[in-house]
Structures are given as structure tokens and as C-alpha cells.
């Protein structure tokens, strides 16, 4: 069975902010032609859209293109929506409220499975969370990383998730990753990346790089040899094999669309076709 792996659609940067479904679908069609490839199934590792309406309509659209669509949430998907261009046509005052709405809407769409802390058909998924343990300099610390996240970073300013208690969020996703990986899915999806994907050199000394990654070795070691871990968040396309401490091999995939002024494939010379993968 062929899977196409993709993430970070940010489709509301490519389509107008609209409540007119026919208008949105015209832009979705062009977006699909430029960024997607045929396959039996599609895995989308988060950041479909900031806007809730665009998010749900994109799910409906993509469901018509593949036999199965698997999705996990991204950091942009779960932002609060309080007073946008459309006034208060639907408010989401907490990220939990928005997450629940997306799960309920996805459950209504045939062929779509939103895997937030869930597993289906041998595919597990969750958004994940950075663990604040990456140190970009010798003077960095978890405390300063968390302070920067809370006061300056997009997530800390636009989420209201567990009251933005970074410690609770880290514990939640550590528990989720352990439970999901222990079920040995053939594909693990997350939006945040295991550090085992590696970080391009130009980001290593950037304090904000900490907010993309977590240490994934304990979870990868739970997976079987030949498993796949798909992630997103960074807008650099990556495809590499990782060998864990137990000698098992895992394929790591990150295929972001990114923003209109970016070229995710440039860093490592990859292309869309590299992310169509045959999975037994």
C-alpha cells in the first residue's frame, strides 16, 4: 500500500479567509495539484490551518482524494480563536475545546482519521510537544527555555492548552508517546520532531530551535525494525534512516509545504516523490 507523507500545509496562506466553500475548494484544488501526489493513503502531520473552518473544509476535500487520510494536530491548528475577521462566528477560548471540535468533525468525514493520542490501522498519532531540553548554548537551561516559550514564542502566546503549563504538557505527551509506541505501530505520526531527525547546522545556535524538538530515543526503541516516524513543524524536508540503541532501523520522514516564500526541499535536495512510500 502506498502512502504519501506531508505536513505543514498552512493552507490559509494559499487560500482566502472565507466561509464560501466553493471558493475555498477552487484554491484547494490548485494547492493539491502543486503539493500532493497520488497514493492509496495520505498522512498529514499537522499544521493544516490556523482557521477552524478552513481546517475542516480541507479535511473534507482531501478525503475525496485518497482511500484513507490520517492526520495529527499541529501547533497552528490548536490556537485560540477569539475575534477574527468573521467576528465571533465561532470562538475557541481553549485549545482543548478546539481539539475536541476537530476530532468530532473528523469523525463525521468518511476516510479521515484524526489521530490525537490515538491509533488506527497500525498508525499512531499525536501532536507531541517540545521537551525544553535542547540547549542551544552552554548557558541555556530548561527554565530559561520555558520562560522564552511562554512570553515570546507563538505557541505560548496563542495557545490556551492546559493553561499553558509547560510542565504538564511535557508530562502529557511523554505519557502519550510511551503508550502509543509500546503498541508498536508501523507508522508513528507527530507534529513536533524527535531530535533523532537531526537539526540543520544553521539552527543549532538559535534559542527558538528548542521549541520544535524532543528527545525521541526512548519511544523509537519501542517500535519494530522497519517502522516509520513522520513529523512536521520544521519547514525543512528530511528523509533519513535512524538506527536506535537496540540496532533497529527506522525511516524518519518530514515533508512540509511551509509558507509561500519557502523551499523546504532545497536544504537536502529532496523532492515530493521521495515521500511516496510503500508500506506493507
Describe each model-derived feature in a short phrase:
Residues 1-71, 77-86, 91:
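N-terminal active-site segment of His-dependent metallophosphoesterases
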Residues 18, 120, 209, 215-226, ...:
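Binuclear metal-dependent phosphoesterase catalytic core
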Residues 124-207:
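Active-site-proximal loop/helix segment associated with metal-binding centers of metalloenzymes
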Residues 68-139, 148:
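A basic- and aromatic-enriched beta-loop-alpha substructure that forms the phosphate/nucleotide-
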Residues 31-33, 57-63, 103-121, 172-184:
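Short amphipathic alpha-helices and their capping/turn segments at secondary-structure boundaries
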Residues 5-7, 42-47, 70-75, 113-116, ...:
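Active-site neighborhood of phospho(di)ester-bond hydrolases with catalytic His/Asp-centered motifs
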Residues 10-16, 49-54, 76-86, 130-135, ...:
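Active-site environment of divalent metal-dependent phosphoester hydrolases
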Amino acid at each position: 500500500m502506498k502512502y504519501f507523507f506531508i505536513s505543514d500545509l498552512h493552507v490559509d496562506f494559499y487560500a482566502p479567509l472565507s466561509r464560501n466553500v466553493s471558493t475555498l475548494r477552487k484554491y484547494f484544488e490548485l494547492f493539491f495539484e502543486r503539493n500532493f501526489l497520488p497514493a492509496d493513503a495520505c498522512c498529514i502531520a499537522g499544521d493544516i490551518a490556523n482557521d477552524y473552518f478552513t481546517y475542516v473544509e480541507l479535511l473534507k476535500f482531501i478525503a475525496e482524494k485518497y482511500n484513507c487520510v490520517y492526520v495529527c494536530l499541529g501547533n497552528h491548528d490548536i490556537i485560540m480563536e477569539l475575534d477574527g475577521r468573521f467576528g465571533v462566528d465561532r470562538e475557541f477560548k481553549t485549545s482543548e475545546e478546539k481539539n475536541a471540535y476537530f476530532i468530532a468533525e473528523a469523525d463525521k468525514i468518511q476516510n479521515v482519521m484524526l489521530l490525537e493520542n490515538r491509533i488506527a490501522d497500525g498508525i499512531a498519532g499525536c501532536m507531541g510537544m517540545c521537551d525544553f531540553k535542547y540547549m542551544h548554548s552552554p548557558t541555556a537551561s530548561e527554565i530559561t527555555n520555558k520562560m522564552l516559550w511562554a512570553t515570546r514564542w507563538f505557541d505560548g502566546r496563542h495557545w490556551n492548552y492546559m493553561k499553558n503549563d509547560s510542565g504538564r504538557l511535557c508530562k502529557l505527551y511523554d505519557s502519550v508517546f510511551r503508550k502509543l509506541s509500546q503498541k508498536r505501530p508501523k507508522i508513528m505520526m507527530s507534529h513536533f520532531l524527535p531530535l533523532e531527525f537531526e537539526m540543520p547546522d544553521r539552527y543549532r545556535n538559535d534559542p527558538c530551535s528548542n521549541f520544535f524538538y524532543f528527545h525521541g530515543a526512548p519511544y523509537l526503541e519501542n517500535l519494530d525494525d522497519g517502522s516509520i516516524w513522520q513529523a512536521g513543524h520544521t519547514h525543512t524536508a528530511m528523509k533519513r534512516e535512524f538506527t536506535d540503541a537496540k540496532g533497529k532501523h527506522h525511516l524518519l520522514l518530514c515533508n512540509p509545504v511551509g509558507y509561500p516564500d519557502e523551499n523546504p526541499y532545497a536544504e537536502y535536495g529532496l523532492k515530493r516523490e521521495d515521500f511516496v512510500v510503500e508500506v506493507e
